[in-house]
Amino acid sequence: MTVKPKLNVLLCAPRGFCAGVVRAIDAVEEALRIYGAPVYVRHEIVHNKYVVETLKSKGAVFVEELDEVPDTSQPVIFSAHGVPKSIPVEAATRNIFAIDATCPLVTKVHREAELHHKRGRQVLLVGHAGHPEVVGTIGQLPAGSILLVQTIEDIASLQVEDEHNLSYVTQTTLSVDDTRSMVEALTRRFPDIVGPHREDICYATTNRQEAVKQVAPIVDALIVVGSSNSSNSQRLKEVAERSGCKLARLVLRAEDVEWELFANISSLAITAGASAPEILVEEIMDAFAERFDLHVEEVSTANEGVFFPLPRELRRATV
């Protein structure tokens, strides 16, 4: 009988689904229950391939643009990342029943940007170019109204209309530390710049990054369960590396684990991005249990009791 090597596993808590992701997935499942298949979803409802494939198997059809929707008698759901204002307008023009599953914390950023614009301030957006959330936020205002700022170097070369009449908002899934540095650089260059009353980085992003900071320096390796196109999952891997973990990997399924890298470790931390379901954490844990004698301990750094109700279009339908 082969003796398995011992492995101490620290499970980060909180990890996995946030309230906005739960709400978005529930919205698709509730729409399927009420209206039947197909239910169309513009863009991946959340950035997790397992979640998307599971919803496809239940009758969801994912599209990138509304002109890909052939049947306007069936609902279309907007993803948790938010959409430009032109998308609901296009849906209304085509008489499409749209259900907005934008995370309420992303909607908060949209409203902040609109308010700054209404008050005559130029808006700077700290975020990553091309991310659906950034595209959606920029699309809340007339073209050219928002300047995207991606790096501290961008700040040094920014050309603004009036440095005394500026505001900023941020993408919700950024690195907390990077964003803090960006905001500090903005306020140094533009002392009069106006920011949000409460930071735009969402509670789940902050909590998951803080949990990783606690465990990363004391383990041989760390796995982030999540998809490669998930911004918050990518940031967790970066946070682990910056916090002193020499081996940090982003893994979606057990089959993706590069086992040769983990052959000689004695301690491992596992977390999951905000769009990664717990079933994938369990799958990866089971795969490690086949190869190691596990001692598992959960490390809790925050308690989350956040809940967001279903989109109002679905609440009306269930009354």
Swiss-Prot record:
Dimethylallyl diphosphate binds at H47, H81, H131, S230, S231, N232, S275. Its EC number is 1.17.7.4. Keywords: 4Fe-4S, Iron, Iron-sulfur, Isoprene biosynthesis, Metal-binding, Oxidoreductase. Transmembrane segments: none annotated. Pathway: Isoprenoid biosynthesis; dimethylallyl diphosphate biosynthesis; dimethylallyl diphosphate from (2E)-4-hydroxy-3-methylbutenyl diphosphate: step 1/1; Isoprenoid biosynthesis; isopentenyl diphosphate biosynthesis via DXP pathway; isopentenyl diphosphate from 1-deoxy-D-xylulose 5-phosphate: step 6/6. Disulfide bonds: none annotated. (2E)-4-hydroxy-3-methylbut-2-enyl diphosphate binds at H47, H81, H131, T172, S230, S231, N232, S275. The keyword Nucleotide-binding does not apply. [4Fe-4S] cluster binds at C18, C103, C202. Gene3D superfamilies: 3.40.50.11270, 4-hydroxy-3-methylbut-2-enyl diphosphate reductase, catalytic domain. The active site is at E133. One of its GO terms (molecular function) is 4-hydroxy-3-methylbut-2-enyl diphosphate reductase activity. GO terms for biological process: dimethylallyl diphosphate biosynthetic process; isopentenyl diphosphate biosynthetic process, methylerythritol 4-phosphate pathway; terpenoid biosynthetic process. Binds 1 [4Fe-4S] cluster per subunit. The keyword 4Fe-4S applies. Catalyzes the conversion of 1-hydroxy-2-methyl-2-(E)-butenyl 4-diphosphate (HMBPP) into a mixture of isopentenyl diphosphate (IPP) and dimethylallyl diphosphate (DMAPP). Acts in the terminal step of the DOXP/MEP pathway for isoprenoid precursor biosynthesis. This is 4-hydroxy-3-methylbut-2-enyl diphosphate reductase. It comes from Methylocella silvestris (strain DSM 15510 / CIP 108128 / LMG 27833 / NCIMB 13906 / BL2). The lineage of its organism: Bacteria, Pseudomonadati, Pseudomonadota, Alphaproteobacteria, Hyphomicrobiales.
